[in-house]
Amino acid sequence: NILEKGTTNGTISDVDGNFTIAVSSPKAVLLIKYIGYKDVEKAVSPMMKIVMEEDSEMLEDVVVIGYGSVKKSDATGSVTAIKPDDFNKGLRTTAQDALVGKVPGVNVVASSGAPGAGATIRIRSGASLSASNDPLIVVDGVPVDNSTIEGGGNVIGGINPNDIETFTVLKDASATAIYGSRASNGVIVITTKKGSDSNLRFNYSTNLSVSTITEKLDVLSADEFREFVPTVSGVPGSVTLGTASTDWQDEIYRTAFGQEHNFSVSGKVKKNAPYRLSVGYNNQNGVVKTNNYERFTFNGGISPKFFDNHLTVDLNVKVSYEDNQKVDESVVNNALRYDPTRPVMTGSATGADEPGLGYFIWMNGNSPMAIQTDNPVAQLELQDLHNKVTRSIGNAAINYKVHRLEDLQLNANLGYDVLKSKYTKNVPDMAGMMYTSNMKDGTGLVYDSKQNKRNYLLDLYANYAHVFNEKHNFSAMAGYGWQHFWKKFDATTLSPEGKELFSPNHYESEYYLLSFYGRLNYSYDNRYMITATLRSDASSRFAKDNRWGLFPSVALGWKISQEAFLRDSEVLSDLKLRLSYGQTGQQDILNDYPYMTTFTVSYPESCYQFGDKWYYTYRPNGYDSDIKWETTETYNIGLDYGFLNNRIYGSVDYYQRHTKDLLNTINVISGTNYSSVITTNIGEMDNKGVEFAINAVPVHTKNWKWTVGMNYTWNDSEITKLNVIDSDANFVQTGAISGTGKTVQVFMVGQRPYTFYLAKQAYDDDGKPMEGQYVQPDGSISATETKYATDKSALPTSYLGFNTQLTYKNWDFAISGHGAFGNYVYNYVAADQYVQSVYSDQGNFSNILRRTKDSGFQNQQLYSDYFLEKGNFFRIDNISLGYTFQKLWNSSSSLRLTFGVQNVATFTSYSGIDPEIYSGIDKEVYPRPRVFSLSANLNF
């Protein structure tokens, strides 16, 4: 930026540094500014040569930490900040899309490929078992509610990625302990864009996209099915297959189109009130027919200053509305199974007054079969599933620099997070799926649920900072926090005619958090640093005697590169050692009242029928009056480095984490509690890992710039205690597949979380699996389905991210990708199939995978480790090519055009569609699409 000093007259240079400016006087002075370089003031002349000097201090990112900010070079904890230039390129429907593969120690896995879908985010693999492992997410100073909503949803789905200025990830206890009770799993601080002191600026961006599926499951074609079925033993010779040739996967998938538009305006009111307003619209069709995601967003902020800049009021409000026309994800699995010799329609008119409404369904005489796979096309066309979410997050942050004692700042932050959701499911009478549901008589339904959540907070804190004798830098912070969470749920189920089919469902709950916290920072001569924090939290989820938890931390830092023996090094430009220890707490469990007796509305499948109406029952919850905080201790040693004037820079961290008093769900002896399952403090878990990040600028000339970045994480977790008496037979089952009590994973002492627990498949001399034969612990082979801990977990032992960008003048080309290794995937799609499943005793048929035919398994082998596969993969996430037009009609206008491809390619040995499944159980969810996009970004 080039400004005429003392005026608002200015311009910007082109990519080569050339500029022209008309000044008001021959004696004018130009002020030249550029990020990462020291400001230059120079008297104007007709021809000017200006050389700017890099500013190493300015190059240091300022990172946001709890209740304050700090230069990255002064941070003693494990903290990573990424900014818009670092975000993944291409279409970013949700905020978490920008984080994939970007931060060491952070694993982001989308829950499905549906537009607007949520994601599982894990920092250092999580610290708990039965309690939440989600990180705390703080948006502009407001810790947001991350509990789920009915019908699915995305915790931060209402935040427009285009409004985000930075993500700051806090990983070790020194960085997170200031958040105390909710920080055991790390913290992600989202800071949105603010106004600036510059002149009025406008930005418009748009993105047009086309999405396609990358691969279909390999099932038998109609002709192959007609040829194979008669060879299956037990199939009566009198049965007749259909004459159609239907590719059911083709029938449910489509090429999907999407569009996104964003507009923002920023500037200042008079001289002391910068502001920014933005609106956004996103409309994305899913690759599964009828699926659509639509979002409207508004983000507004203004930061007026008063009393000679001593008082700053920062007002922020974010409002979003999401309308998600969902699909029942079972349609993907049903398309795999449905008989390919049957037509989509029966030949009758659509909507015909007959069972199925014109869509093919299996009939037993004149009555639909009660047990059958639903017609996937009918599921899409006849079911109307909508999830509408309105959310607003906002706060008023007040900062007062005390007059005549400006080193002391008083702060108040009042915030809120309010959410309203409405989930509806409408199915007409006589739709095929209404003959296989609870009603089984073809009666349609109108299901309507409403959920309300309110989260209010108040933070009052003071900051004091002073430099003594130019070498002693001291700062302190102390504060008080209060937060209230409330939620309510109501649901009704009616027939299309308005008749009540189920009794109404209602619940309401709340909890409070109360906190006192403080932090001390001291550094000497910009070389030696110490940070200490202390936080005391009370949670209403625990009884009075166990309500308070105390969470301390301490961290040391040493800037080795500032020592005399390295200060003048031409090779080493930065070297800082970090050491930290701290404790954090956990109280995020499903029940807000786990220490007292409560009753919960039953599941729909546990309803009972009285007359023609179904009634919900109430079941007692198990409780533990002595339940208390889960506590995690973390040790961290880290090294930040830079070489060749930071042309090469990065960090290395090693951490050890120990969680005790695990909030764990365990079985208890019947009769000793209201339930045979309770949540209590029992168990311990160890977690350790290494994180490595390196960034380099191999080429940086006048016209060329090439940057490369990579991060790698290794992590290992082990459960060290789980029950009162730990033994091989005393473990917690998890990893449900289908049906009551069917699980394939365990929590077991000596194992990693989510270790697969299966029977060891026996093979013949040719390496072919022997049906119904398993290897026993003594090495013998028998038909006994003896399960064992496989030592193979759904959790990766390592994962990495990679990105590179090449810039030539106004052109830029970028590639990014990520991968995970050491994890295993249970292919339930394949395990749930067997040769005999092609025909049922009722007389209906189901398709199978080609591999099922080849394996020859006649009967279901759900617990065979034959279906457990390596889940290693590396995915090229994004490739983009862009061009920027400078100075379109004035010096401050620019236009950037970008073409991008997402989900470019996945390299894996996994036999299913996609190995990236956080649970490690492949139930054939909505596939991730490949997306082609064209975007434009206009600034003026």
Spell out what each predicted region is.
Residues 203-243, 593, 680, 697-794, ...:
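Conserved small-residue
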Residues 87, 134, 226, 236, ...:
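Extracellular/periplasmic, surface-exposed regions of secreted and cell-surface proteins
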Residues 218-220, 427-429, 493, 725-726, ...:
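Short Gly/aromatic-enriched secondary-structure transition segments
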Residues 1-306, 311-320, 362, 393-394, ...:
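Short, small/polar-rich motifs associated with maturation and membrane association
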Residues 793-826:
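Glycine-rich, aromatic-lined ligand/substrate-binding cores of catalytic
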Residues 32, 137, 522, 747, ...:
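Short aromatic-centered micro-motifs
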Residues 237-239, 249, 377, 818-902:
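Extracytoplasmic gating/loop element in the C-terminal half of outer-membrane beta-barrel translocons
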